[in-house]
Amino acid sequence: MEESVVDLRELPEKVFINLRHSRQRYDWDCGIACVLMVLTEADRESFMRDFVSVCKDEGFHRSTWTIDLCYLLRRYNVDHNFYTVTIGIHPGYHSNAFYRTVLAKDEQRINSRFGEAKMYGINVHEGSVEIVTILRHLRLNGPAIVLTNARLLTCDLCKLNKVSLELRQCLPWPAGYQGHYIVLCGYNKSRRKVYYRNPSFHNRVCVMSIDALEDARKSYGTDEDLILIDL
């Protein structure tokens, strides 16, 4: 694959954000594990202690969308901004018969949460975010939770070229797409790499190229969902 042209000259050479790793426990909670990575120690312990009741109170049970993660972050007073190219549920997802039941179950809740987001102090922005903006945020503000296609994730360190047996499916999509949340925590400009934490794995920092990240986060099914965290 030919490397894309992204002007990184304005950015410092390296950035790395220390985070306490959290591994997902089930096949549906990768996004929740990512939220845990950006909480304070006290809030993290509180959430884990009341995990079942919090999930029930939030109403997502075993089906979490990015907007659900935003409500969780707001619950624990974590400042953030949510960017997506689709407000609500993409109409194209209804055409797949296999997912009709899942979407029918979630659609009303998701649309309601989008509709009430402003009232709850959740900033939702419609549109695509350039990679330079994301890297600049890592430098100035904090980590980012990114929805990716797990089948396109790579890691230079653990030689993860495609989705591994260790990587669990988090969202019920067609075979070509497996939705999976990761936490971006830094970059190396000269090597054109980003650092990220994958909640499917034990405590480790993964590394992939900027171009690989762009492919994974802009794959059909992700809506380019991105949560920029302000720590």
What are these regions (language model features)?
Residues 1-5, 136-141, 145, 149-231:
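Noncatalytic regulatory segments and standalone regulatory/sensor domains
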Residues 1-120, 150, 175:
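Active-site-adjacent structural segments surrounding the nucleophilic cysteine of cysteine proteases
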Residues 14-16, 132, 171:
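Hydrophobic alpha-helical segments, principally membrane-spanning helices and signal/leader peptides
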Residues 21-25, 127-140, 184:
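N-terminal short leaders/motifs
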Residues 30, 47-48, 65, 130, ...:
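Helix N-cap and loop-to-helix transition residues
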Residues 55, 59, 116-137, 154, ...:
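Cysteine-dependent deubiquitinase/ubiquitin-like isopeptidase catalytic cores across multiple families
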Residues 66, 127-131, 177:
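A structural signal for well-ordered alpha-helical scaffolds and beta->alpha junctions
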Residues 92-102, 128-129, 134-137, 198:
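Short secondary-structure transition/capping segments
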